[in-house]
Amino acid sequence: MEYKMNFDVILVRYGELTTKGKNRNDFTRVLVNNIKNKLREYEKQYQLKKEFDRLFIELLDPTVSQPIINIVKNVFGSSSLSLAKRVDRDLTTIANCAITLVQYYQPDTFKLEVRRSDKTFPLTSTEIKQQLAPKILQQTNVKVDVHHPVLQIDVEIRHQFTYVFINKIKTIGGLPVGISGRGLVMLSGGIDSPVAAFLTMKRGMNVEYLHFATPPHTSEEALEKVKTLVQKLHHYTGQNQQRLHVVNFSMLQHELMHIPDASYRITIMRRMFYRIANILAAKWNCQAIITGESLGQVASQTIESINVINTVSPLPVLRPVLCFDKNEIIAIAKEIDTYQTSILPFEDCCSLFVPKNPVTKPRIAQAEFQEQNLMWQEIIDVIIRKNIKTYVIDRDEIYEES
């Protein structure tokens, strides 16, 4: 439904935040800050007021209601929102507002719901509905359908005002980004890791991004693809800025070509990724590593491989898509608009160096044996000091950090 009528308030429901008890104020504070960050362009056209179970975005310019809705519904931390008219608490005024809505949208059927948040109001919700419904029916040609109405009108009576609104708009849900700490996402540029980043942020964790490149074997187009993915993901955060760290892995990649058993090459490479990620996570105050690994999807993602790779990571490794099948991951990627970018034909450093027959059931002792004559510790030290570029994502801009 297009909302062409001028409304003066957007009512935002907290959803999952209502279960957070003593932490509730922290959750709502972060949500409010994230919404304000995303609405910077419209900061002079609205006022935001917080109540116990709702946020009220009061529109100083009703013409910006649709762009504000499009932004707020994609900020993690709310369950739904509604465009509302704010009116006085007398029943005649409420009925007139509802009649105006019915006359404007001209639905064949409607349903009326009443919620009395202010329990001191002299009538119950049922009594209010019994008085409002006949007034609406007398002034319009609409019919009542309580099961499948074309238009649902909700009336919410609060302490100072009444809010009359139509149709709840489902929002993205989750928890506000920033409430669950900070993690480091290993972003390959494929389909899975952007989905893993999205799901992690949906649980309230702010993230930094880590990408491994092997120039000249990986192209500048491959890096631009990763930058585009990060910008798309940043759209959901509500954070002012996020950062993408690009590690030049070429020196270590060439060292790994000296592994005696080539079938262990990907296993050892991923162990090196995790070692570097842990060092950088500590440097950037991240409490977890996040990957797009999906159990059994490729040779390096069998449970045996995951176990061998995990042993080098002191930090917990979160794998949000571990038990998703490929079609489920693709469905989410399409929903969050990362899929078409992820399938662009630019290879990452893993795909370029996959051996013909990668080991699917590696052993820790054998992995350690393959590493023992490599100069990986010295090379990682050089990488950390010299071979990392950082890009800042700020709204629609991305630029290299000086």
Specify the residue positions occupied by each region the protein language model found.
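RNA-binding accessory domains that recognize and position tRNA/RNA substrates
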Residues: 2-184, 194-242, 311, 359-364, ...
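Active-site adenylate/phosphate-handling loop in enzymes that bind or generate adenylated species
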Residues: 131-136, 174-180, 253-336, 386-401
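General small-molecule cofactor/ligand-binding pocket signal
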Residues: 145, 245-247, 318
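Generic beta-strand/beta-sheet core signal
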Residues: 167, 210-212, 247-250, 291-292, ...
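Conserved G/P- and acidic residue-centered "switch" motifs that form tight phosphate/ATP-binding loops
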Residues: 190
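A conserved beta-strand->alpha-helix junction
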Residues: 230-258, 348
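Small/polar glycine-rich anion-binding or flexible loop at a beta-alpha turn
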Residues: 297, 345-353
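A short alpha-helix-loop-beta-strand transition element characteristic
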Residues: 337-345
